[in-house]
Amino acid sequence: MTQTLADMRRDYTRDGLTEAQSPDEPFALFHTWFDDAVKTEQPPVEANAMTLATVDEQGRPHCRVLLLKGLDTQGFTFFTNYESAKGQQLAARPFAAMTFFWPTLERQVRIEGRVEKVSAQESDAYYQVRPLGSRLGAWASPQSRVIADRDELEGLIRQTEQRFADTQPHCPEHWGGYRLLPERIEFWQGRSSRLHDRLNYRSVDGRWTRERLAP
């Protein structure tokens, strides 16, 4: 018999999360959990994959999966086309939420905060270490815009390859990084009977407070 959606579930029994295990600020815990994910998660799961949610000018939410490409005590960095749908949404409403899910570890992290562009120098530094095809794609693809078909896209790629046939492509002005400056970070550890552990960090006047949330 085919399993129905209502019957699809798994119990979480791997680990717990206590206040005693958790530092006073969230970045150290995120680093620990991220390192655990890198060591534990196997393809097709990518440890740095996260869902990014933004809101358009009408208040409608949009989400998509991206890759985290930078992390420091300021925040979480990702790169994209500034003229894409998410780029336009962030220009109008510079706030976003990220969610990381690591199924093997039965862990999830939710991050919310304000978003700002990184410097042109930081964007260029990352752009230059990307594979050549990805660098050309940043020039060729009019991201999020309607195109006729795949042939149109491949034609744009060929034009871009010809344009940079004798030189290395540089970072286009319409492409670069954003940094999410976290105001809230929640760590979720799956537990048995859906009685999950949830530790929530909030930034208040530049200082982090920690609290437990009911599952």
Curated annotation (Swiss-Prot):
Homodimer. Pfam families: PNP_phzG_C, PNPOx_N. FMN binds at residues 64-69, 79-80, 86, 108, 143-144, 188, 198. It is an enzyme of class 1 (oxidoreductase). Catalyzes the oxidation of either pyridoxine 5'-phosphate (PNP) or pyridoxamine 5'-phosphate (PMP) into pyridoxal 5'-phosphate (PLP). Pathway: Cofactor metabolism; pyridoxal 5'-phosphate salvage; pyridoxal 5'-phosphate from pyridoxamine 5'-phosphate: step 1/1; Cofactor metabolism; pyridoxal 5'-phosphate salvage; pyridoxal 5'-phosphate from pyridoxine 5'-phosphate: step 1/1. Its EC number is 1.4.3.5. It catalyses: pyridoxamine 5'-phosphate + O2 + H2O = pyridoxal 5'-phosphate + H2O2 + NH4(+); pyridoxine 5'-phosphate + O2 = pyridoxal 5'-phosphate + H2O2. The gene is pdxH. NCBIfam families: pdxH, PRK05679.1. GO terms for molecular function: FMN binding; pyridoxamine phosphate oxidase activity. This is Pyridoxine/pyridoxamine 5'-phosphate oxidase. Signal peptide: none annotated. PANTHER family: PYRIDOXINE-5'-PHOSPHATE OXIDASE, PYRIDOXINE-5-PHOSPHATE OXIDASE. The lineage of its organism: Bacteria, Pseudomonadati, Pseudomonadota, Gammaproteobacteria, Pseudomonadales. It comes from the Bacteria. GO terms for biological process: pyridoxine biosynthetic process. Its cofactor is FMN. Belongs to the pyridoxamine 5'-phosphate oxidase family. Substrate binds at residues 9-12, 69, 126, 130, 134, 194-196. Binds 1 FMN per subunit. Keywords: Flavoprotein, FMN, Oxidoreductase, Pyridoxine biosynthesis.
